[in-house]
């Protein structure tokens, strides 16, 4: 009986955390990395970031761009952008990136209005929080 209850609890938890394609619009915007969890369980936390990621998705395609926030609430950036292609398979959402130098894939493991996490093929999990620009000008 205990095994059945444990199985049902795990099933409920795993079903409740599934990310729906309708939620992908939440990825649009500015994000800063907060934590990296390595395969062995060790973590690295980031309290201050000199760059943030800007993500723009339209349907299942988009891009990610590195931005440098300034103290007046604006950003500096380059013309470089990493194309993103979203792939949905086996009830999972994958973010595929291709640049001139590399190709990689991350699985989206959590997504909300305030944060998201992805895991790469090396077992490293990246957790991001929504970035709020700082404006010190009155």
Model region roles, listed by residue range:
Residues 17-32:
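N-terminal helix-cap/turn-to-beta initiation motif at the start of protein domains
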Residues 81, 119-138:
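Edge beta-strand at a domain terminus
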Residues 27, 54-63, 88-92, 109-116, ...:
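Short, solvent-exposed coil/turn segments at beta-strand boundaries
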Residues 33, 62-66, 93-97, 116-120, ...:
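Short hydrophobic/aromatic-rich beta-strand segments that constitute the beta-sheet cores
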Residues 44-90:
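N-terminal glycine/threonine-rich, aromatic-flanked beta-hairpin/loop signature
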């Amino acid at each position: 009986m205990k095994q059945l209850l444990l199985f049902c609890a795990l099933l409920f938890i795993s079903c409740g955390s599934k990310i729906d394609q309708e939620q992908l619009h939440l990825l649009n915007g500015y994000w800063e990395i907060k934590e990296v969890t390595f395969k062995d369980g060790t973590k690295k936390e980031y309290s201050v970031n000199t760059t943030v990621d800007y993500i723009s998705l339209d349907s299942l395609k988009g891009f990610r761009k590195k931005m440098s926030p300034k103290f007046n609430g604006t950003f500096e950036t380059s013309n470089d952008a990493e194309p993103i292609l979203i792939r949905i398979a086996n009830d999972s959402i994958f973010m595929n990136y291709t640049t001139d130098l590399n190709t990689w894939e991350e699985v989206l493991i959590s997504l909300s209005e305030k944060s998201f996490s992805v895991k790469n093929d090396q077992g490293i999990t990246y957790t991001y929080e929504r970035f709020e620009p700082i404006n010190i000008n009155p």
